Amino acid sequence: MPFSNYIYEYYDGISSGNITVGKWVRLLYEYIVKGLQEGLFTFNAKKANKAIRFIENFCHHCEGRTDLLKLELWQKAAVSVMFGIVEEDGTRVFREVFIVIGRKNGKTLFASAVIAYMAYLDGEYGAKIYCLAPKLEQANIVYDNFYQMIKKEPELSDLSKKRRSDIYIEESNTAIKP
């Protein structure tokens, strides 16, 4: 399967006017694409597409029919930025990501899928992943959604243990907390 660079594909859509985004998103992708072209950033398509494939093959909707997720182009581009843009030693350049998404557009589901990838396949032993929000109740929504998501996938569920204060993955010594 050939690797795609969804960052360029998304940026091309923005540049051509086929995809409408705000000023800050346009500037961000201009910066990223320029950085890739000038060698400021290194793009590892294998890492980016590994994250995308994981999300689309192991992460389920938690309500309704519980189908597997199918990421939209902007989500694939965002995941590519998060996991595919790396330093020469392979560490991620963007370690913190701020994404603004309108109401009822899948923020919780997308965040849960990214958490799932980081917890199960990112390769960081002893990771501590926190669901943060202005209120604990909001953080618990993402945490609970993540838990429901992994319960739908036996391969992930078998590796996980729900404890009183977290979800623990013994194989990687990883804990996910609200």
What name fits each language-model region?
Residues M1-P178:
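Phosphate/NTP-binding elements of NTP-utilizing enzymes
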